[in-house]
Curated annotation (Swiss-Prot):
Its EC number is 2.7.7.6. Coiled coil: none annotated. Zn(2+) binds at C217, C291, C298, C301. DNA-dependent RNA polymerase catalyzes the transcription of DNA into RNA using the four ribonucleoside triphosphates as substrates. It comes from Trieres chinensis (Marine centric diatom). HAMAP family: RNApol_bact_RpoC2 (MF_01324). InterPro entries: DNA-dir_RpoC2_beta_pp (IPR012756), DNA-dir_RpoC_beta_prime (IPR045867), RNA_pol_Rpb1_3_sf (IPR042102), RNA_pol_Rpb1_4 (IPR007083), RNA_pol_Rpb1_5 (IPR007081), Rpb1_funnel_sf (IPR038120). This is DNA-directed RNA polymerase subunit beta''. In plastids the minimal PEP RNA polymerase catalytic core is composed of four subunits: alpha, beta, beta', and beta''. When a (nuclear-encoded) sigma factor is associated with the core the holoenzyme is formed, which can initiate transcription.
Length: 1481
């Protein structure tokens, strides 16, 4: 040791590290080794001599522990009382509890340390804690302080702390809590180690072929590293980042301009010292990310080998070293948290205390906004840096000035008195990792919601809401239920509160009842005592039935096939919506074969349906004889289309003489029902009611049928006896055993090899030429065609090309007339009862659709005559109709039975309440119609004295009973100045808190209540709680008549500007445009504009408008029209103003920043409004503006309240949601998955909150565009946990920014120009660089939070492998395929060749791959197959015919070659030189 000064300092672990590092750098490794050995022996020697042991006496508990615990208990009790008074939320109380215990634990620890330092510095416990070996202060705290708050397995905090320490001993409860909070030891370690090991494997696999192959890649790119210092605290030095790298640009002294270091100089500690002295802040260094080699890195870009602090050797396998360096700390960190056993620790915040007592004054520059902390304190947050002055009490003293940074929480207001050493302000910790969670607020009692009116203006501004729940019993009842009590009534146990009657429709007998307690299982079955008789009819069963309906019904001479169900030898009709009861057996509409039917489908659609009746108010005056109605107001146009001809039947009425409708003469039938509403017409005289019933009397209903025989045969083509295009006669054999029914042209089509489809188009064929005139025409009987051919029946002509001549096929048409169907009275001859709960109807059904081919060779029925059973009651499923024949009288009797399930009689929301049933009927009892069958009721479990009751109607009836149990009586003199309906908060006894119900001069009756507090609350009345509340203007005329005052109009225009800030002035109106930049950071959130459709803000200040009416001009929309000019290349636009009539103009009300009037008028600003107009342009697509690329869209979450004033709530009901920030305990258990997420480049699921009118959120676009507190943030900085940016999204955003074709506007000359910032390669390269820095910093921030330092170059090697691929979007003239993945350097090489040959290059977008995907996309298929998905990789490689060049380590080892690294690395330096012997020759 040449020059060594004597060190008289305490050498701890940190100093030992520095000592060894110094010796290693200054001397060689051998000397450093011997020094380490010497130190080791020295340590062991003195440890042996000291003989330090630990005994129970060394564990000294601080004497003031009990006092600290007592103070903590008092604080917690007081916060509990404040919570019950409704001044704190549940979340804030919990936070306060945590803070209190945390502070107690910390102060105990501080007491302990100060005691040891002062009185017992050689205490063995103290030595262990501060030795820097495996000991830790948190363990000492548990030994002699208090264990403190514990967390459960999911990381949630338990409210109860462990107050004891190990010296005092734990109770059983404490021990259980300790075990609950600690991680599950072995299992946890094993899992996490496996996880970490797998991460290491993937990292090595992705980078195993990265070797130092060359000395210099001659790259022009470099990384810029800036050493910047922020106002708040000086950031960690960046000099350690550049140690061991090579400079890519020379460094000059800024003042003297002399050269400090040249290009390619290695950055050594000496050079760093020089840079610090000269205060150089910018360095351009080389990095593995900037190296231009393919799948390898050059010596100069990598820099030092960190093992020996020399330039790395050629052939060094840096990929594997990088993988191990990143993966190994993961294994270390997983095992690190087990010493403390799940103890919660939170850092104490940095605070500013007042040095003197005095009055606080803020500077005018300091902008402050009121916020509420998570501990329930109303404080001020500074939006910019500024200062405050404390004016002292003593006259002679000087005022004290304190500087405050941005985002400082200030606890005192302006002009407020402050005492000495009181906390003035607290710094907001930016580095703290938090996540926002939502906690539902549940009621603890049932009762009525009461929201008192806000008297305090501050509460109104802060949007706080106080909600009382006044105690009471809440019941829900059906709407028409009868209540069984009054005020001051006493209800006994087991009596009912309300009742609802159950009444039947028709008379009959009860067949079945059950006495089940549950309402779901309670059933009552009734059978009607009267049957409906169908005369002259009987049911017969078919002997053998191919049909699904085996029974038929004989009525007179008609036979209907009917659908019956046989049950206990009784016939039942099964009721369902799509089934028909019976079908008439008739051959009238039967065709010989299949074919095509044509009819007017509009007729068919309306035959089945019932008569429609449309009610309409007819304003008419008695003097006028005619009424005219507009077409659209009367009927929907769709409804009218479905009718062909509507006939008019007019009922004569003295009030309505000659009512003709102006628009539909003879199309409507008009029933006047004025007499029913006579009281109505007498009052108004000018109004009358008329009903329009559309009567469907169709003069024609014909079906035209063109027959076509169709066979589908499973046979070989050789077996067919006919060929395609043959004309065959009737009864011709097609295949053996099958004969045609009609004659005509044969068409054969192959469905597949085995199935042949044969179609015979019926008709007669004529051969000849020039048949085009007859093609697709219809001829009628009596017409003559082809000179001599007379048509005998309606025919359709088709033309075909034959082998020799054209063929004309004349196909006969059959016309089926559909008659008016008879009513049932005409069929059955007698009237039937109308009082039954069902009726029979006679309908017609078409079995074929118009113009649709029916492929059939057998007979086919076109039209069915149908009997339908229609049910009138609502419970169709519970309905049965029984049929039985009376053979003597030849009658058929219909008997109705109804199964009543009581569950169907109440609303769905009441089904799960306590409603019970009580039936008054027995089995086999006769019941007349409209008899009370029973009741639905709710019984009471205990007797109550009712003080008051309230009921209200919604969907159901809600009842709130206030009984004597819900009230308290106190003497009147204890509550002075309070009247009825006043709220009372009792500080001493929380049970006597509530609302005053009665007052009898001596005593006061209080309804018990409990307040719930919701700060920063959203009102349901206001639609959106953002700066910009908007509502659409219905019409442009609204503004002209209104007297709302403003003097500022705001245009929110969509522009597409990519560079900086541009100020424009249009001289007529003084318009100033401010264009926002690419990335905007607002209150800790990053916003970006996708596709660069950025919003700008234009404030038009019209000085003449001082508190005048708004002119109607702002409701215009500017529209630009594009004009192509042939002379000039630039496209010019003309500006056009156009009035708007839709809802495109938005009206912004009460906006905080917009309406701050520059003229400062003193009028009430409640009426002020802002008109925003959007510019529409047709010739380019713009997006919806700025989207957030972070997890949260909005800076401050709003608490929600779900109940309104006067609403009745039940116990355990959710009445609102509270948002709160939760601190995440820094632990690699959260860290490892986060590293994995970043390196695997997982796509985060984006929660879509950017709906324009989303009630919970708000209008994002306008919120971000009109906000003065934008903060721009470089992407090179580390990002907090709650600002997780999706890297895929970021890559897309940047590529769009750099690579998309942009449109630029100039508003003065109205011109538009288009170009892009960079070409495709440059845009991809730059986008990749941005994402690389993001991933690098994100991974480093996770490791740094654990106190692990990894050299950047290791991560850079890995990240480079993730960001080399691109995805082809258009192949151009290259041989690539769309969506093919290829290396960026490769595609650039291909495109370069394409450009030389003047071909179209391929287009592509950058693609970010995770480490697994990157390893599988390795150019070596042997390496990829040995990693994962072996079969798939090898199959794909075999199909593609890929060649493996055996470049990496893995593939060479698998094949059995020498590893191409270290001594085995191939050197090609002499390959291209002539040999020495050749040179001699």
């Amino acid at each position: 040791m040449k020059t060594y000064t004597y060190q008289n300092t305490l050498i701890s672990k940190k100093q030992l590290k520095q000592l060894l590092s110094w010796s290693f750098t200054t001397y060689d490794s051998m000397q450093a080794c011997s020094l380490a050995d010497e130190l080791k022996y020295l340590g062991f020697k003195y440890a042996s001599k000291a003989g330090i042991s630990i005994s129970i006496e060394d564990l000294k508990v601080p004497y003031n522990k009990n006092l600290l615990l007592k103070i903590a208990h008092q604080e917690i009790n007081s916060s509990e009382k404040i919570y019950l008074k409704g001044k704190l939320t549940d979340v804030e109380r919990f936070q306060k509890l945590i803070d209190t215990w945390n502070l107690t634990s910390e102060s105990l620890k501080d007491e302990l340390v100060s005691y040891f330092k002062r009185y017992d510095p050689l205490n063995s416990v103290y030595i262990m804690a501060f030795s820097g070996a495996r000991g830790n202060l948190s363990q000492v705290r548990q030994l002699v302080g208090m264990r403190g708050l514990m967390s459960d397995p999911s990381g949630e905090l338990l409210k109860l702390p462990i107050k004891k320490n190990f010296r005092e001993g734990l109770t059983i409860t404490d021990y259980l809590m300790s075990g609950y909070g600690a991680r599950k030891g072995i299992i946890d370690t094993a899992l996490k180690t496996a996880n970490s090991g797998y991460l290491t494997r993937r990292l090595i696999d992705v980078a195993q072929d990265i070797i130092i192959r060359e000395k210099d890649c001659l790259t022009k790119h470099s990384c810029l590293i800036i050493n910047f210092e922020s106002n708040l605290r000086i950031k960690k030095s960046v000099y350690e980042k550049i140690l061991g790298r090579l400079l890519n640009k020379s460094i000059y002294d800024e003042k003297t301009k002399e050269l400090i270091a040249e290009v390619n100089t290695q950055v050594t500690p000496n050079l760093i010292r020089t840079l610090k002295q000269k205060q150089i802040k910018h360095f351009y260094v080389r990095s593995p990310l900037t190296c231009s080699l393919y799948r390898s890195i050059c010596q100069k870009c990598y820099g030092w080998d960190l093992a020996n602090e020399n330039l790395i050797d050629i052939g060094e396998r840096i990929g594997i070293i990088a993988g191990q360096s990143i993966g190994e700390p993961g294994t270390q960190l997983t095992m690190r948290t087990f010493h403390t056993g799940g103890i919660f620790t939170s850092e104490i915040r940095g605070t500013i205390r007042s040095p003197i007592s005095g009055i606080v004054k803020f500077s005018k520059r300091l902008k402050r906004i009121p916020i509420r902390t998570n501990r329930g304190e109303d404080v001020l947050l500074t939006k910019n840096a500024g200062s405050l002055i404390i004016i002292p009490e003593e006259k002679n003293s000087k005022p004290v000035k304190l500087e405050l940074f941005r985002n400082t929480v200030v606890f005192h207001k302006n002009n407020q008195y402050i005492q000495k050493n009181a906390i003035i302000a607290e710094l907001v910790d930016d580095e703290k990792q938090t996540r926002t969670e939502i906690k539902p607020v549940l009621t603890t009692t049932s009762g009525e919601v009461f929201i008192p009116r806000i008297i305090n203006k501050l509460d109104n501004i802060n949007k706080t809401k106080l909600l009382w729940i006044l105690s009471g019993n809440v019941y829900q009842a059906p709407q028409h239920s009868f209540l069984n009590f009054y005020n001051d009534y006493k209800i006994n146990k087991n009596s009912y509160i309300f009742r609802t009657k159950l009444i039947n429709d028709f008379s009959g007998f009860t067949v079945f009842t059950n006495s089940k307690y549950n309402l779901f299982q309670r059933i009552l079955q009734l059978v009607s005592n009267s049957c409906w008789i169908l005369p002259n009819s009987k049911i017969q069963k078919l002997q053998s039935s191919l049909n699904k309906k085996p029974y038929f019904l004989n009525i007179k001479k008609l036979k209907y096939l009917i659908d019956l169900k046989l049950l206990n030898s009784k016939y039942f009709i099964e009721i369902s919506s799509n089934k028909h009861f019976g079908t008439l057996v008739t051959n009238n509409y039967q065709t010989l074969t299949g074919g095509i039917g044509y009819y007017d489908f509009r007729c068919r659609d309306r035959i089945i349906s019932d008569n429609k009746t449309i009610s309409y108010f007819l304003p008419w005056e008695p003097k006028k004889k005619s009424i005219s109605l507009e077409f659209l107001t009367l009927l929907e146009s769709q409804f009218l289309k479905s009718f062909d001809i509507l006939s008019l039947i007019l009922k004569k009425n003295p009030d309505l003489e000659d009512c003709r409708l102006a628009f539909f003469p003879n199309n409507f039938n008009l029933h006047s029902k004025v007499e029913t509403f006579s009281h109505y017409s007498k009052q108004t005289n000018s109004l009358n009611l008329a009903w329009f019933s559309i009567v469907k009397q169709f003069p024609y209903r014909s079906v035209i049928w063109m027959s076509e025989e169709n066979y589908e045969l499973n046979c070989d083509k050789n077996l067919l006896l006919v060929e395609h295009g043959n004309f065959i006669s009737k009864n011709f054999e097609i295949v053996p055993g099958i004969v045609s029914k009609t004659g005509g042209i044969v068409m054969i089509s192959d469905k597949n090899k085995l199935t042949q489809e044969i179609t015979i188009k019926t008709g007669s064929v004529y051969e000849g030429s020039l048949f085009n005139y007859f093609k697709n025409k219809i001829f009628y009987p009596g017409e003559i065609i082809l000179d001599s051919l007379k048509i005998t029946q309606p025919s359709f002509c088709e033309c075909f090309e034959g082998r020799f001549n054209d063929q004309l096929l004349i196909r006969p048409l059959q016309v089926y007339e559909v008659p008016q169907f008879k009513s049932l009275i005409q069929i059955f001859g007698t009237k039937f009862q109308t009082d039954l709960p069902f009726n029979l109807t006679n309908n017609i059904s078409y079995r074929c659709k118009s113009n649709k081919i029916i492929k059939e060779s057998r007979n086919f029925t076109i039209i069915d005559n149908i009997l339908d059973v229609n049910i009138r009651t609502f419970a169709k499923k519970q309905f049965e109709i029984e049929l039985f024949s009376d053979v003597k009288k030849n009658h058929l009797n219909f008997l109705v039975s109804e199964k009543l399930s009581l569950n169907h009689f109440i609303l769905p929301q009441l089904r799960y309440t306590d409603i019970q049933s009580c039936l008054l009927v027995q089995t086999h009892q006769f019941i007349d119609s409209y008899t009370i069958l029973g009741y639905l009721e709710v019984m009471i479990s205990k007797s109550l004295e009712i003080v008051q009751f309230k009921s209200k109607y919604k969907d159901s009836k809600q009842i709130c009973l206030i009984s004597n149990e819900d009230c308290r009586t106190i003497p009147k003199n204890s509550v002075k100045n309070k009247t009825i309906d006043n709220l009372l908060i009792n500080n001493a006894n929380v049970n006597y808190t509530g609302k005053i119900l009665m007052d009898n001069d001596e005593f006061v009756t209080i309804q018990k209540g409990r307040p719930y507090f919701f700060p920063n609350c959203k009102n349901e009345e206001a639609i959106i709680n953002t700066d910009l509340i908007y509502k659409p203007l219905q019409s442009s005329s609204f503004l002209d008549n209104s007297k709302l005052k403003t003097n500022r109009l705001v245009y929110l225009n969509y522009f597409d500007i990519t560079k900086g800030l541009i100020n424009q002035r249009i001289h007529s109106q003084d318009i100033i445009c401010k264009f926002s930049k690419m990335f905007i950071k607002k209150n800790g959130k990053l916003y970006s504009s996708l596709l660069a459709g950025l919003i700008n803000r234009i404030a038009i200040i019209n000085k003449q408008l001082d508190s005048q009416q708004i002119p109607s001009c702002p409701t215009s929309i500017r529209k630009y029209r594009e004009e192509n000019s042939s002379k000039k290349l630039k496209k010019r636009m003309k500006r056009k103003y156009k009035k708007i009539t839709g809802i495109k103009t938005l009206l912004f009300i009460k906006n905080s920043e917009l309406n701050l009037n520059p003229l400062k008028d003193t009028q009430d600003r409640k009426n002020s409004l802002t008109v925003a107009t959007f510019m529409l342009s047709k010739f380019y697509k713009f997006t919806g503006g700025i989207h957030s690329i972070t997890e949260d869209y909005f800076d401050e979450e709003v608490n929600s309240v779900f109940c309104k004033n006067g609403e009745f709530v039940k116990n355990g009901q959710t009445i609102g949601l509270l948002n709160f920030e939760k601190e995440i305990t820094g632990d690699i258990v959260q860290g490892l998955p986060r590293v994995e997420q970043l390196l695997e480049a997982r796509k985060k699921k984006q929660i879509t909150k950017n709906l324009p009118i989303n009630k919970k959120k708000g209008l994002l676009t306008q919120t971000t565009s009109i906000d003065s507190y934008f903060e721009f943030k470089k992407l090179g900085t580390s990002i907090k946990e709650n600002e997780k940016i999706n890297p895929h999204n970021l890559l897309k955003v940047y590529f769009n920014y750099y690579g998309l074709i942009k449109t630029f506007f100039c508003e003065n000359s109205y011109t538009k120009d288009s170009y892009r910032l960079f070409n495709n390669y440059e845009a991809s390269y730059r986008s990749f660089k941005k994402v690389q820095s993001l991933i690098l910093n994100s991974v480093q921030s996770v490791y740094k939070s654990q106190g692990v330092s990894i050299a950047d170059k290791h991560l850079e090697v890995i990240i480079k492998q993730m960001t080399t691929k691109v995805l082809i979007t258009h192949q151009g003239n290259t041989s690539l395929l769309p969506r093919e993945v290829i290396d960026l350097y490769h595609i650039e090489y291909i495109n370069k060749i394409a450009r030389i040959h003047k071909k179209h290059p391929a287009l592509y977008v950058p693609l970010l791959l995770g480490i697994t995907k990157a390893a599988l996309n390795n150019p070596s298929f042997i390496s990829a197959a040995s990693f994962q998905e072996t079969t798939r990789v090898l199959t794909k490689a075999a199909i593609e015919g890929r060649v493996d060049w055996l470049r990496g380590l893995k593939e060479n080892i698998i094949i059995g070659h020498l590893m191409p690294a270290g001594t085995g690395s191939p050197v090609y330096t002499n390959c291209f030189k002539k040999s020495f012997e050749n040179n001699l020759n």
